[in-house]
Structure formats: C-alpha cells, structure tokens
C-alpha cells in the first residue's frame, strides 16, 4: 500500500509553530515510507480565508525546505487556474486527485451530501437564526451542552418538499446516531471510545451558501485523495468520532489516525503570542535559519536517538517513525531554539554566511545610502528581512568577507550582524562620556588609556597574535587595572558600543590610521577638559 498523507490548513492566518510541526511530521512520515505528501488548502471559511495567507503557506514551506508532491502553489508542476468561488483565482498543482483547494471542489461535496440525504443519513434543516438563538439560550439556561435540538430531523417528506419549493433558506445536517458508541485505535494514544450521545448533535454538513463545513470537506477529500494516514494535532481528537461516523455513512474505509502531542509554552499552556514569536514569519525576520527551525521543530514531541541534537533533513526523514512520538505535550523552549540557531550559523562557511547576513545588513542601512529607485522597487517586492534591496558592491562584499570570521562566533541570529559590522562601514556614534568609563575606573584613568591607545594601535596592527595578548596585558598592568577595563574605553571609541567584534581583529581591519583618528575624535569631544591622569602613556 502506498502511504499518502496530507497537511490541510485553513489560510486564515500566518503559519505558526503548531501547524509547521504538523506539516513537518507528515512530510517526514511520507519520506520515511517513500510515500506521497499532499498539501491541501481548506478554505471553506470564506469570511476569514485570504489569498495572502494561502501564499504565506506556500512561502513558509518552501523556506523551510518542506516540499510537497501534490497540492497548490507548485510552480514545478503543471498548473491550471481554478475558480475559488469568491471572485478570485488560485493556481492548483498537478496531481491525480486535484484540485487541491476546497473552494474549487464544492460540486463534489454537494454530490456526496445528496447521497447521504437519499439514504436517510442527512436531512434538510430550515431553522432560522432567531430560532437557533432561542435554542442556544434554553440549552444554556438548562445547563445542557451546546448544540442543535434536532427539530428538523423528523420533518415529513412533504414538509421538506414544500419548504424547498418555497425557497426557504436551509442547511443540511448529519444524523448522528442517538445511541451506541464509536471506537477507534489511535496510532499514538491507543484505544479511544466516544459515546455517540456526547457527539455534537447533528452538525451541519452543507451551509446555506452551498459551501461545506470542515467536517464534510475533510472526510470527502481524505477519501477522494486516497489518504492512508492522518497525522494531526490532539485538539482534533473530539472531532474524530464524527469523522468516523461519516466514513461509515458513506461506506468508506477510514485512514489510520495519529493525533500529535500539543506544543506548550513554558507555563504549561498552549503555545501562543504571550509566550513570544509563534509564526514562522516572525522567526524568519528575527534572523533564524530555516535549517535550525526545522531541526528544532522536528524534535517537539519526537525522539531521534540519544546523544545527538543536530540532524539534517535527510537524517530526520530516515529516522522518523510514529513509534518515536511522545504522548505527553512538547514544551517550546526559545533558549534551546536560539542555541540551535547559533550552531547552524557557525557551521556555515564564510561565503555562505556573508550571503545570509547581507540582506539584514542592507535593510538596516548599515552600508550607506541605497539609490531611491532601487529602494522603491525593493519595497514593492520585499516582504522578509532576509530579502535584500540590492546586491553588495565588490568593496562591501570584500569588507564583509574580512569581518565574517571575526563575528561568526558571536552570532546567535542573523539580526545580530548589522550592529556588529556597522563600525566597519560607518563612523560610530559618539556615546556620552559615562559609556567609556568602566565602574572600577574614573574619567582621568580612561583618558589616559585612550591617550596610550593611540600609540598601541600601530603595534597591534603589526604584531603577532601571541605578542598582542602579552602587550595588552602588560599595558593593563602598568595602569594597575584589569585587562577588560583597559580594553573597554578603546572598544567604545572604535565601535561606538560596549559589545563588539573582538577588539584586536577590529583594529587590524580598520587599520592604524582609521583607529587613531577615531580615538583622537573621542579624546577631543569627550575628554578634552580633563587634564588629570595624563601619565601612564
């Protein structure tokens, strides 16, 4: 049997960590079994679904390197245009079971619902909004669970025909059995049984506008697309008995279900905005590498072996198995993800890292003015921080290639790069005097250090690495201060910041002349009125 799985989100928002984890597990499962990964868009909620969010789905998966074999948004396959039903059009990928957007499949859903009506397993409901609101209030008052009261379930055929002939607005509801239970075996959670009386009473299958509800479209599409395994979040467990009843009503074999563990924040609640970034776009714009995010998300609720954290996509595909999934919720650890990101950044070659950090540097305006026409064109097309407005000049690229080895160990995110490299492309800002003065030094001592630094930079540029360290320690001892306190004023003078790339490397790249000029500028602007402690140089 060919394994066929799917990721079927609704394009009602940006792709978030929970959805990406579901997509990734389906992708890995398909690859582990040489199967097919289908991407289906469930856009039946016409009031909330947008083309922009659908495009975000495709962009996100492509950025992560999660490829699909059938589905929408695939430029690699033959494409045709299909009507969405709302005046817009969308590209549908090739595949034997398309289209892969539900709004283009409404005829199929209506035909299948008609089958259920004919066999007495679904019925027309003519209750209007005011009556349904009265039912809701009564059930709430009587402390009954929410749901329909089955008022139209036993309408006589002639009553139904009369209402239809009169054009009374209607929906079509499913007849949930009034007794008995529905049982299924979940691949992760084991045996689950649900009393039919606890299932939402006679849910709507087809809405008054002719569009299907999620439950109908989900079941019809999974059957029509030959889906063999459904891997989805545990929040869908309560819906599974209804889906199984629909499979039974249609006379279809259901797929194997596997409900994945929830993704929680550190406080034990479902991961949400209050915990931090949750959408893939946020992580992308914050300077995370797709490989790092993919690797970390793949480990949320799944174990791949002891003693190893970093896996390539190919290794994840080879190791993934439903037997490796954990039943308990996974906790999203932002610090651990940051560690992953740093590891992947440092594994990049200087050439690769130069290309990766350039967009963030250019977008931060570090490398100078971007021509207005170039910037205007870039603004129209650029949606992510890792999309550059222009390519670097040869001089900019050459400078970056010298700086990258200096900053690589200090990068946790690509967004760290602009401030670390700014001093190599621009004259630094001039902080207030207090920024130059460590807690254990006074203003006079700092001025003396800076005066001495003017002469030191020439020696630093020409000396070997071991000799430079000996030289700097000796100078700090002459002043009777710690090495870190000795270097701090020099660092701020050269970079404008208390945190920077390694100081010796910075001086060598800037050169003696440029370094001396910056130190002179600081002495003149911030320490010219202080004549104390000039000695020591």
From Swiss-Prot:
CC terms in the record's Gene Ontology section: cytosol
Family annotation (SUPFAM superfamilies): An anticodon-binding domain of class I aminoacyl-tRNA synthetases (SSF48163), Nucleotidylyl transferase (SSF52374)
Protein name (Swiss-Prot/TrEMBL): Glutamate--tRNA ligase
Compartmental location: Cytoplasm
Gene Ontology biological-process annotations: glutamyl-tRNA aminoacylation
Enzyme Commission number: 6.1.1.17
Residues that hold Zn(2+) according to the record: 125, 127, 152, 154
Enzyme class: ligase
Entry similarity comment: Belongs to the class-I aminoacyl-tRNA synthetase family. Glutamate--tRNA ligase type 1 subfamily.
Pfam families, per database record: Anticodon_2, tRNA-synt_1c
Gene: gltX
Organism (species): Treponema pallidum (strain Nichols)
Free-text remark on how the cofactor is bound: Binds 1 zinc ion per subunit.
């Amino acid at each position: 049997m060919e394994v066929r799985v799917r990721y079927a989100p609704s394009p009602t928002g940006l792709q978030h960590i929970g959805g990406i984890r579901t997509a990734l597990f389906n992708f890995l499962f398909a690859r582990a079994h040489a199967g097919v990964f289908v991407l289906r868009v469930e856009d039946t909620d016409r009031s909330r679904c947008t083309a922009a969010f659908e495009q975000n789905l495709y962009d996100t998966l492509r950025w992560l390197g999660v490829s699909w074999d059938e589905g929408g948004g695939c430029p690699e396959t033959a494409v045709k245009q299909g009507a969405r039903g709302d005046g817009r059009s969308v590209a549908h990928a090739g595949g034997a079971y398309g289209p892969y957007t539900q709004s283009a499949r409404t005829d199929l859903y209506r035909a299948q619902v008609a089958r259920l009506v004919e066999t007495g397993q679904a019925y027309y409901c003519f209750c209007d909004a005011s009556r349904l609101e009265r039912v809701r209030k009564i059930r709430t008052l009587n402390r009954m669970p929410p749901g329909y009261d089955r008022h139209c379930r036993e309408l006589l055929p002639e009553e139904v025909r009369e209402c239809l002939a009169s054009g009374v607005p209607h929906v079509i509801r499913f007849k949930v059995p009034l007794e008995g239970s529905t049982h299924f075996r979940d691949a992760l959670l084991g045996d689950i049984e649900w009393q039919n009386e606890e299932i939402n009473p006679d849910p709507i299958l087809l809405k008054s506008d002719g569009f299907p509800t999620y439950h109908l479209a989900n079941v019809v599409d999974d059957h029509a697309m030959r889906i063999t395994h459904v891997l989805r979040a545990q929040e869908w467990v309560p819906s599974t008995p209804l889906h199984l009843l629909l499979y039974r009503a249609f006379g279809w074999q259901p797929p194997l279900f596997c409900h994945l563990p929830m993704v929680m924040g550190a406080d034990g609640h479902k991961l949400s905005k209050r915990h931090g970034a949750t959408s893939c776009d946020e992580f992308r714009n914050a300077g995370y590498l797709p490989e790092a995010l993919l690797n970390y998300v793949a480990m949320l609720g799944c174990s791949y072996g002891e003693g190893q954290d970093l896996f390539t996509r190919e290794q994840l595909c080879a190791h993934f198995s439903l037997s490796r999934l954990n039943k308990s919720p996974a906790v999203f650890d932002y610090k651990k993800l940051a560690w992953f990101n740093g590891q992947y950044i440092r594994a990049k070659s200087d050439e690769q890292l130069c290309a990766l950090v350039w967009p963030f540097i250019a977008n931060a305006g570090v490398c100078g003015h971007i021509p207005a026409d170039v910037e205007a064109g870039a603004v129209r097309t650029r949606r992510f921080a890792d999309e550059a407005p222009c390519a670097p000049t040869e001089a900019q690229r050459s400078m970056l290639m010298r700086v990258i080895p200096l900053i690589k160990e200090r990068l946790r995110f690509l967004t760290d790069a602009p401030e670390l490299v700014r001093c190599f492309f621009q004259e630094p800002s001039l902080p207030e005097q207090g920024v130059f003065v460590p807690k254990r030094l006074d203003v006079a001592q700092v001025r003396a250090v800076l005066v001495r630094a003017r002469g030191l930079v020439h020696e630093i540029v020409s000396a070997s690495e071991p000799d430079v360290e000996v030289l700097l320690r000796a100078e700090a001892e002459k002043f009777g201060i710690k090495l870190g306190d000795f270097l701090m004023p020099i660092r701020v003078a050269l970079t404008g910041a208390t945190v920077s790339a390694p100081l010796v490397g910075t001086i060598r790249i800037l050169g003696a002349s440029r370094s001396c000029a910056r130190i002179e500028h600081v002495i003149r602007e911030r320490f010219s009125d202080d004549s104390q402690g000039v000695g020591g140089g």
